[in-house]
Amino acid sequence: MNNNKRPLYIPYAGPALLSTPLLNKGSAFSTTERKYFNLEGLLPEAIESIEEQTGRAYKQYQSFENDMDKHIYLRNIQDTNETLFYRLVQNHISEMMPIIYTPTVGAACENFSNIYRRGRGLFISYENKNRIDDLLNNAANQNVKVIVVTDGERILGLGDQGIGGMGIPIGKLALYTACGGISPAHTLPIVLDVGTNNPQRLADPMYMGWRHPRVTGDEYADFVEDFIQAVQRRWPEALVQFEDFAQKNAMPLLERYKNRICCFNDDIQGTAAVTVGSLLAACKAAGSSLSEQRVTFLGAGSAGCGIAEAIIAQMVSEGISDAQARSQVYMVDRWGLLQEGMPNLLDFQQRLVQKAENTKDWISEEPNFSLVDVMRNAKPTVLIGVSGAPGLFSKEVIQEMHKHCERPIVFPLSNPTSRVEATPNDIIRWTNGQALVATGSPFDPVSHNGQTYPIAQCNNSFIFPGIGLGVLAIKATRVTDEMLMESSRALAECSPLAINGTGALLPPLEEIHSVSKRIAFAVAKKAIEQGHALEITDEALHQKIESYFWKPVYRRYKRTAF
């Protein structure tokens, strides 16, 4: 696939070629190409290399003073010259990742209709429920291999954004390419526009989505089913990633489709995989195993419960029983600790309740155990925040944990930054530098008592691009829990702290390509072992992954007729 030295035969010419983001080279078109593609006079005289173009683009990028303007600028480059966009992002990955994705993408979703410049991907509204096949045929990219789809109901920690949620599939697929080497020609972002219950969006005259309360129940389920069937007819081998669906839909959709099509839910499974990988690295750095930990969650939604189930599976793989593993995991939501007999729990929450026999000797002034009560009685060694509620990891909570645990592992994972349960600076100060910290959004290193503590970003971008690369390279037909487990273990093996005893918990973003390839290999090996892909040798698998990995370089063009 990575045949950059071979010419590419294309039928477009003139303004049509310059208006095609996947093919446009701008000032990098050669003299010969300008002649044969009717570009003479349409471009300045100078012929530039991609590095010269990137240098100019970076200077322009630096001229913008706020992150939203930088985001809009980068999206404009993406919509005019994709090769240049990805070269620019790869050259400045640590700087630009927070701009093209979290945390800036959250504000971009909230303001989607106000900053809209050009359509990208597909907007499939409920009004067109009987024409989904036609809409898929209208996609700009026709050789689609990976789809990221959302209905916009639970965008990060920001709630229902309607079609504004399209910013998430666009951003996620940009990371599939920038981090995982998936060609942008093979990607398709989709938003299922089933209305919105956000009164601000409905009242906004600029809102571009379907102005209607959200479709729910059987009508909603049937619409999603029609969409999945249409995708299967159009691109039967495509990987489908569900993204930012509300809790009431996320888990049921995953359960319905995970054994029917090649799909996964990044909020549930991707978040779980990167968290388990980070925990494995933290445990290794602390000289212990995951099965020895007592883990408390703040947030018992689909993401938190998905992480918990993945942790339990890893604990069991280390030799303890399922019952023992579940007794070491404590789920806390707004009503307190999930316990036997609690009303109105969802099925996936019921599997994670604490049995009464495990809490019968606990001391508390309230019948529902609070987070502080859990800290005091369970004495957890790991604390994970997926609540979307800022500031709930208070000084009292963290210091109570530190009383019983010399090196607490604290992961406030809520996105964006404004929703984080506690800042790394506070956690480091409250534990006198003893906590191992990873966050969902990027944070600067923390200085405390003369030491600098790098803060790992426990971000799904370390996981899902590698999963996608592994699945697509061997045309795997499913994404299984075991494949995801292998991705966690592969990520843990890349941890500087676990390997060297110093540095960050997770590798720097500058190493993301090697990390993604390592994860891809582990995921693909497990897929082959489980019979979800044709068997090949390890050497051939490495070659497939390398050959599949797209690089942002300009191809030579030759003209062909329509």
UniProtKB/Swiss-Prot annotation:
Membrane-spanning parts: none
GO process terms (BP): malate metabolic process
GO molecular function, one term: NAD binding
Catalyzed reactions per annotation: (S)-malate + NAD(+) = pyruvate + CO2 + NADH; oxaloacetate + H(+) = pyruvate + CO2
Binding site for NAD(+): 154, 267, 415
EC number, UniProt record: 1.1.1.38
Cofactor(s) of this protein: Mg(2+); Mn(2+)
Site (Important for activity): 267
UniProt: a divalent metal cation binding residues: 243-244, 267
Note describing how the cofactor binds: Divalent metal cations. Prefers magnesium or manganese.
GO annotations of cellular component type: cytosol
Active site: 101 (proton donor), 172 (proton acceptor)
UniProtKB keywords: Metal-binding, NAD, Oxidoreductase
Assembly information from the UniProt record: Homotetramer.
Family: Belongs to the malic enzymes family.
Official protein name in the record: NAD-dependent malic enzyme
